[in-house]
Amino acid sequence: MIYGNTKGVKRVTLETLENLITDYDKNAFVDRELLATVAEISGKLNREICVYISRSGRVMAIAMGDAGTVELKEFSLRRGSDRFSGVRVIHTHPNGNGRLSDMDLSALKHLRLDAMAAVGVDRGETTDMEVAFLEGNGFQGFYFKPAEAADDKILKKITELEKDISVGAESTEAVPGTAILVNVTQNGSGKTELSELARLADTAGLPKSFGRVYFIMAS
């Protein structure tokens, strides 16, 4: 699927992009020929182009923007707050600067992408690439120059960081609280007052286990 700002783009160019929507090596962060073709078209049109790639290596969609922006849509193949979307985004910067912008990082976080990559393009050729992953409340980034130097091993970061998120989610799951009710009394009415404390604990939703009840008598 090709979407976005396709106005004025020749049919042959759209067909070339359409033909890129297929399966690639899942162990490659981005196929080199795919990247070269997208960079060439991005440079020729002076428009940002965005490519969505699944973990299986399939290009799911390609979006076209203008010289400075491209619309990002949500493509999520996985569910759960402790999971990433299962989709990574590689997009071009036809100004020749492959550094990720604040807007790029915001989209990475909002869409919970596997990764966000920006590729600098100068006269149809790639210059550099920056890749970012979600890590906790922040990001982990890698910079490559030239762009073709991008190490496919960074794909392992996706599963590693996602595993860290899952472990963190498990450790922060709400655990029912337990109350130890202790009443210090001087007038012998401890049992009545402890019953009142138990009622308050019940109102708060705390689980109770009744066994022996000990009263601490103040002198």
Where are these regions (language model features)?
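N-terminal accessory targeting/assembly segments
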Residues: 1-219
